[in-house]
Amino acid sequence: MKLFLCSHFSSVGSLIKEEIDNKKVAFIPTASLREGYTGYVGSARKLFNKLGATVTEIDISTEAYLTIQSVFEDADVIYFTGGNFFFLMDQLRKTGTDKLLKKELEKGKLMIGESAGAIICAPTIQYIEQMDEKPEDYSQEDDAGLDLIDFYVLPHYLTAPFKKVTEKIMTEFSDLNLCPINNRQGIVIDGEGSKVICKD
């Protein structure tokens, strides 16, 4: 399974430019739809274009399943923006896109997860609840994540405006295998394991 998980894609995406150049990218901004600030969505879009990708944007919360399936099957890379991780995970499970995603990843496609998109890869997303509110219309009975990795990404570590909350999560969930990353770091996961890489 190939994953690239980060806090802020436009700051570190160039580290994997060879994985993006000339590739078809399914761009999922769904997590950002409930957020006030969404500047990171536009900056990610710009970087993909700069790196030579062909981008198809699709919102899994409103699009028909067959359309999502078609876009995912056609893509080389599947990218999830940051935003509200509970809303994103709810929509993934509600629409069946979670199973669709796993099927495509089994084919060797690359998933890029930024912030919320990285958090959802863990076995559960409950550990990160202090960073964002659970929507009132959250429809799941539990806080299960995609369970693609056996550790828990803590994005924006010691980075404003998340400095205090990330410190608190590190302390309160010290029993979990947390992997804190700042906005200049990314985690590369492949068949050989995982490693943190950094943008100078």
Name what the model sees in each region:
Residues 1-77, 81:
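N-terminal beta1-alpha1 cap of cysteine-dependent amidohydrolase-like domains
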Residues 33, 83-86, 117, 158:
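Short glycine-rich anion-binding loops that position phosphate/pyrophosphate groups of nucleotides
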Residues 55-56, 111, 194:
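Hydrophobic anchor at the start of a short beta-strand
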Residues 17-18, 39-40, 90-93, 124-126, ...:
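Short amphipathic alpha-helical segments
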Residues 90-91, 97-159:
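Class I SAM-dependent methyltransferase SAM-binding "motif I" and its flanking Rossmann-like core
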Residues 86, 118-121, 186-188:
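Short, active-site-adjacent cap segments at secondary-structure transitions
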